[in-house]
């Protein structure tokens, strides 16, 4: 394929488009098809930067003219195949060309949809570059015209490939500068909004059938929520809805990976811990209403629920226990939330509940007890702290069935076992409560203890 062949065919095709002259349409389409096949071979030369720019400068003006759309699509496919080898300075020109096409588009058809697909493929094929703000502006234009949930799979695939190529972490030992630049866009971050919207379209209930593109996208989410700048980004959000969305996303994503490294864990724990310390004191305000009778702090419940779910999932890692050791204010706040929910929200029992009834702060107590279980396991230090902060009595009080907190009884019994293990003070604390008939003997039996009276004193002993 010679330069003359490329230039001649591009010139003829553009001339036909600009003059709406399609008498040689079949010939031009065949010639473009030949070029497209040849362009797949990386050993062949690409079109010149000037010719690529000429193609991208053109915008169809008649969306009823099928010949025009097919011919222009052929030129764009040529650009798509050349994209990996093109000067990255052409990236903003592609984005601008795509924007012009979207603005001019006044009706859709099979061929306009195919052109849109090719445009996304061009963007996806470009080398990684630093035009983050250009990409963000383009995503804003896209959102003004389309809803992500309505995008066909054929378009979603190159969108995901584009996001992954531009923002994934290539080397965990080197700062991801592209993602850093993206996370510096605190306001009107259209790319981050798109990432969240795409996340909502993945069916996590059927993990065995998550396709390659979605798996790649999930790995990008790992990079985003563990990036060193994500904490600052999420803390700078003015809309509580955005924070709630990303907490919800993270509560799902942390369940899809079991090999978090310490750097990733510290990043996750840091921004979740920071948000928890912000929202925990507001739990009392969650009962307040505005003058219109609307809940002014409704987000607090959603956020605390998500954060405790994230902590519960990450508690299995030693780094989480170390994090709680280092940030000493976190455990008291956790037990404060535990106590507030225990005191203010009635358990839902089989007798009291309606079918499928769900109360407020659903599963939060179970999540907190799970966290306390991991912290107290083989740790005298945490056993003591939890008792001193009132956590042991709360765990004892929740060895019950509560439909608002599935499996809370089972989790509380496990936690109680860890709290009593090799801890005489905790055992005596429980014995004193048992003497007052506060503790169910059956619960003690289930954790392997029994009550004895020795020299007139009640004690708890291993069975």
From Swiss-Prot:
Question: Which BP terms does GO give this entry?
Answer: cell division
The record lists the membrane-crossing segments as none
Top-level division of the source organism's lineage: Eukaryota
Q: Where in the cell is it found?
A: Cytoplasm
List UniProt keywords, sorted A-Z: Cell cycle, Cell division, Cytoplasm
The UniProt entry's GO CC annotations, sorted and at most eight, read:
cytosol
Q: Cross-referenced InterPro entries, in alphabetical order?
A: ARM-like, ARM-type_fold, Ataxin-10/CTR86_families, Ataxin-10_domain
One Pfam family it belongs to: Atx10homo_assoc
- Protein role: May play a role in the regulation of cytokinesis.
Instruction: Give the family this protein belongs to, as stated in its UniProt record.
Output: Belongs to the ataxin-10 family.
- What is the name listed in the Swiss-Prot or TrEMBL entry for this protein? Ataxin-10 homolog
Gene name?
Answer: CTR86
């Amino acid at each position: 394929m010679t330069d003359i062949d490329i230039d001649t065919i591009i010139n003829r095709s553009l001339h036909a488009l600009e003059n709406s002259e399609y008498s040689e349409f079949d010939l031009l389409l065949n010639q473009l098809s030949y070029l497209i096949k040849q362009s797949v071979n990386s050993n062949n030369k690409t079109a010149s930067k000037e010719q690529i720019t000429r193609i991208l400068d053109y915008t169809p003006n008649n969306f009823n003219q099928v010949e025009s759309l097919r011919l222009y699509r052929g030129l764009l496919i040529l650009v798509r195949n050349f994209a990996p080898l093109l000067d990255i300075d052409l990236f903003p020109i592609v984005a601008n060309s795509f924007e012009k096409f979207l603005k001019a588009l006044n009706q859709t058809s099979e061929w306009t949809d195919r052109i849109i697909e090719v445009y996304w493929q061009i963007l996806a094929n470009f080398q990684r570059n630093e035009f983050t703000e250009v990409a963000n502006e383009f995503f804003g234009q896209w959102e003004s015209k389309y809803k992500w949930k309505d995008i066909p799979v054929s378009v979603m695939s190159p969108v995901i490939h584009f996001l992954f190529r531009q923002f994934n972490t290539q080397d965990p030992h080197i700062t991801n500068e592209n993602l850093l630049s993206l996370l510096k866009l605190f306001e009107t971050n259209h790319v981050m909004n798109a990432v969240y919207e795409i996340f909502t379209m993945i069916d996590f209930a059927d993990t065995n059938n998550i396709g390659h593109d979605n798996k790649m996208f999930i790995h990008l989410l790992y990079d985003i929520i563990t990036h060193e700048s994500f904490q600052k980004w999420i803390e700078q959000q003015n809309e509580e809805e955005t924070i709630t969305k990303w907490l919800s996303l993270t509560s799902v994503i942390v369940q899809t990976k079991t090999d978090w490294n310490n750097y990733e864990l510290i990043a996750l724990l840091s921004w979740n811990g920071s948000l928890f310390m912000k929202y925990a004191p507001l739990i009392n305000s969650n009962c307040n209403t505005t003058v219109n009778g609307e809940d002014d702090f409704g987000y607090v419940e959603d956020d605390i629920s998500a954060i405790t779910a994230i902590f519960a999932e990450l508690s299995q890692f030693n780094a989480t226990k170390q994090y709680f050791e280092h940030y000493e204010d976190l455990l008291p706040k956790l037990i404060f939330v535990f106590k507030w929910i225990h005191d203010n929200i009635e358990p839902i029992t089989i007798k009291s509940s309606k079918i499928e009834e769900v109360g407020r702060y659903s599963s939060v107590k179970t999540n907190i007890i799970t966290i306390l279980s991991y912290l107290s396991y083989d740790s005298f230090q945490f056993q003591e702290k939890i008792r001193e902060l009132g956590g042991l009595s709360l765990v004892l009080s929740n060895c019950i069935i509560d439909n608002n907190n599935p499996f809370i009884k089972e989790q509380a019994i496990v936690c109680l076992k860890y709290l009593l293990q090799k801890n005489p003070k905790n055992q005596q604390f429980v014995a004193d409560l048992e003497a007052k008939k506060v503790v169910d003997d059956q619960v003690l039996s289930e954790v392997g203890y029994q009550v004895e009276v020795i020299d007139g004193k009640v004690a708890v002993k291993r069975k």
